[in-house]
């Protein structure tokens, strides 16, 4: 079994950078759907997204963003923000989300795009300026959506899907599908997931297959 991350999984395939295709895998379930947010350091000069955008437009290319690598979900989020708001920035890719957000907290960059679970253990060290969703997040009711501010008005984030190799027998897929559903309905699991900032979102095998197709 393994995880795939949408939309990165499909983006890598569509750009010809993968040695596999969508048909190389058999979907089991979707585990988590995470919403992207715009982050700055807690003591940043930017208190609103409008502050950040104004600075970026007044100082083309000077604003720096840490990302988790080219074409990764957080890099896509930063690109979407810059495109929809109409500014230039300098992208600094790191080896992963942990390093990306460490750079933000150490003041090496001005902003980042990440998911809530990515910074759940150090929320006091960052400020959330906006969320990529049609509605405000329950955990951040005072933080506006991008659409409210006149920018990108759709959901953006990551869906974490569990898959098996193509050709895995249907009874095996069904076994794991049922097992993960049972796990994700467990009260202790749900409590732990909430504490970690995870947005659990179980989808069965058929619905996960449809989700993967939708993101192509």
List the model feature ranges, each with a label.
Residues 1-4:
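Periplasmic-binding protein-like
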Residues 204-216:
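Extracellular/periplasmic bilobal clamshell ligand-binding domains
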């Amino acid at each position: 079994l393994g995880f795939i991350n949408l939309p990165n999984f499909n983006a890598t395939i569509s750009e010809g950078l993968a040695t596999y295709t969508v048909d190389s895998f058999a979907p089991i379930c979707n585990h988590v759907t995470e919403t992207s947010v715009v982050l700055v350091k807690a003591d940043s000069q930017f208190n609103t997204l409008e502050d950040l955008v104004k600075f970026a437009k007044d100082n083309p290319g000077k604003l720096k963003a840490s990302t988790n690598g080219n074409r990764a979900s957080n890099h896509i989020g930063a690109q979407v923000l810059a495109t929809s708001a109409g500014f230039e920035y300098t992208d600094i890719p790191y080896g992963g989300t942990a390093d990306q957000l460490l750079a933000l907290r150490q003041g090496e960059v001005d902003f980042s795009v990440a998911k809530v679970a990515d910074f759940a253990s150090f929320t006091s060290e960052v400020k959330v300026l906006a969320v990529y969703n049609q509605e405000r997040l329950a955990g951040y009711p005072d933080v506006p959506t991008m659409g409210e501010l006149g920018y990108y008005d759709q959901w953006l984030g990551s869906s974490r899907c569990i898959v098996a190799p193509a050709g895995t027998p249907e009874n095996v897929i069904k076994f794991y599908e049922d097992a993960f559903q049972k796990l994700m309905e467990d009260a202790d699991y749900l409590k732990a997931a909430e504490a970690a900032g995870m947005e659990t979102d179980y989808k069965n095998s058929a619905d996960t297959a449809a989700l993967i197709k939708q993101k192509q």
